[in-house]
């Protein structure tokens, strides 16, 4: 990645933060990466994930107890922990051209630098109980400033999009290995191990815990287990797993089947629908409209495969598609898998919640250039939702005998990471899979 892309990224961040500080009457802001936290009653720490707002400024993964101080109109400061420790790894300050744009200072404690900061200052990130007592001018996590910064996070810089592309490359490599493992009959646990190895990461480095679901388990949307035992039959693999690069996440889902027949046809139809919706994710399009188009697309699949005899319009009226596709179409993607600001309509924090027909939709904004989103339609055979349909929706028109034959397959989800552009979209995930074949 070029130094110029990072320098441009840093310049954009400085302008955004300077403007937000001016509008909220702050002189500066301190961003905290966070500190290690521990399991209750234990000296064993949780896996560390730096606070995203701090990570956004750095071209490398942040460690605990790193602070970034931005003073309006001045060169940003990176305060790096200078520890003497023979129990743990002591991380040196990373080298490179990035530091030409910074004041880099090794520090041993908050007491060493926090009392010297003057002016009205915001503290954003995990709270340090001792911090307010060291500087009376601190305001901890002020909402007005957070609203402005969270809203801007949706618009990705060239540097950020490149990080997301690299995360997709790693994730796609893992998915190809997972597919091969499934086709050779491996267990969920072994499929997961192959994914991690091919994507070049450990489980604690994943941007989110990977989902590896065989057969009926694919009907559990966030299936947490990874069974070490092989099932009697290998019908379906649904894998929802990503990778990270520079703190930026890929979020990729694929569904595979070992055979042919109706379920294989359903996978192809969902894939076609997914590509169509992803291509429509362009500047000026309301994301809620894309979700409604996806519901209509699911209804069409149900009708054409004779799973439901009702017309598309009748299905939508009775909310049949939501039985088979109960989650939202997608979300903002970036430093967090479910990136911030999805319901936020402006910089002051005005929210637009999803309507009752799509209660789980994580993104209600109109799409704009340089947003990065996921597009993830699904079609599942979830016993609880199907039972509710039979009990509560008269004249549902669904072929319950046919559905019984599909329940052992669990379900389908196909998910890509898409950059919104003017007049077209860029599908990072499809590009990454294509690059593996080049």
UniProtKB/Swiss-Prot annotation:
Its cofactor is Mn(2+). One of its GO terms (molecular function) is metalloexopeptidase activity. It is an enzyme of class 3 (hydrolase). GO terms for biological process: proteolysis. Mn(2+) 1 binds at residues 251, 331, 376, 415. Mn(2+) 2 binds at residues 240, 251, 415. Its EC number is 3.4.13.9. One of its GO terms (cellular component) is cytosol. Keywords: Dipeptidase, Hydrolase, Manganese, Metal-binding, Metalloprotease, Protease. It catalyses: Xaa-L-Pro dipeptide + H2O = an L-alpha-amino acid + L-proline. Pfam families: PepQ_N (PF21216), Peptidase_M24 (PF00557). Splits dipeptides with a prolyl residue in the C-terminal position. PANTHER family: XAA-PRO AMINOPEPTIDASE 3 (PTHR43226), XAA-PRO DIPEPTIDASE (PTHR43226:SF8). This is Xaa-Pro dipeptidase.
């Amino acid at each position: 990645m070029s130094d110029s892309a990072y320098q441009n990224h840093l310049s954009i961040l400085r302008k955004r933060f300077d403007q937000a500080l001016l509008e909220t009457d702050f002189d500066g802001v301190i961003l905290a990466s966070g500190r290690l936290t521990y399991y209750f009653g234990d000296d064993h720490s949780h896996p560390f994930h730096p606070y995203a707002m701090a990570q956004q400024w750095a071209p490398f993964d942040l460690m605990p107890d790193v602070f970034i101080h931005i003073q309006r109109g001045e060169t940003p400061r990176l305060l790096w922990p200078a520890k003497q420790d023979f129990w743990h790894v002591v991380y040196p300050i990373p080298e490179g051209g990035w530091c030409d744009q910074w004041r880099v200072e090794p520090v041993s404690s908050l007491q060493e630098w926090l009392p010297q900061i003057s002016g009205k200052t915001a503290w954003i990130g995990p709270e340090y109980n001792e911090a307010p007592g060291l500087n009376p001018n601190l305001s901890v996590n002020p909402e007005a400033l957070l609203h402005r910064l969270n809203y801007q996070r949706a618009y990705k810089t060239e540097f950020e999009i490149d990080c997301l592309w690299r995360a997709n490359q790693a994730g796609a490599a893992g998915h190809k290995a997972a597919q091969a493992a499934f086709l050779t009959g491996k267990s969920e646990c072994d499929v997961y191990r192959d994914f991690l190895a091919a994507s070049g990461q450990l489980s604690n480095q994943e941007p989110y815990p990977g989902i590896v679901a065989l057969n009926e388990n694919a009907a559990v949307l966030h299936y947490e287990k990874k069974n070490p035992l092989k099932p009697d039959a290998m019908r379906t693999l649904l894998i929802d797993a990503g990778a990270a690069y520079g703190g930026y996440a890929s979020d990729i889902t694929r569904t595979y089947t070992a055979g042919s027949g109706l379920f294989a046809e359903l996978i192809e139809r969902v894939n076609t629908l997914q590509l169509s919706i992803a291509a429509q994710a362009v500047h000026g399009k309301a994301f809620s409209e894309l979700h409604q188009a996806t519901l209509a697309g699911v209804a069409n699949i149900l009708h054409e495969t004779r799973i439901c005899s009702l017309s598309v319009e009748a299905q939508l009226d009775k909310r049949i598609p939501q039985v088979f596709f109960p989650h939202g179409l997608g979300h903002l993607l970036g430093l967090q898998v479910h990136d911030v600001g999805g319901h936020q309509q402006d910089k002051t924090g005005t929210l637009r919640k999803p309507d009752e027909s799509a209660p789980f939709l994580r993104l209600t904004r109109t799409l704009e250039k340089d947003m990065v989103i996921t597009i993830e339609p699904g079609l599942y055979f979830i016993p609880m939702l199907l039972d509710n349909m039979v009990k509560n929706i008269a004249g549902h028109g669904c072929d319950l005998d046919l559905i019984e034959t599909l329940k052992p397959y669990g379900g389908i989800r196909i998910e890509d990471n898409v950059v919104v552009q003017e007049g077209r979209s860029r599908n990072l995930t499809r590009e990454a899979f294509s690059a593996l074949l080049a």
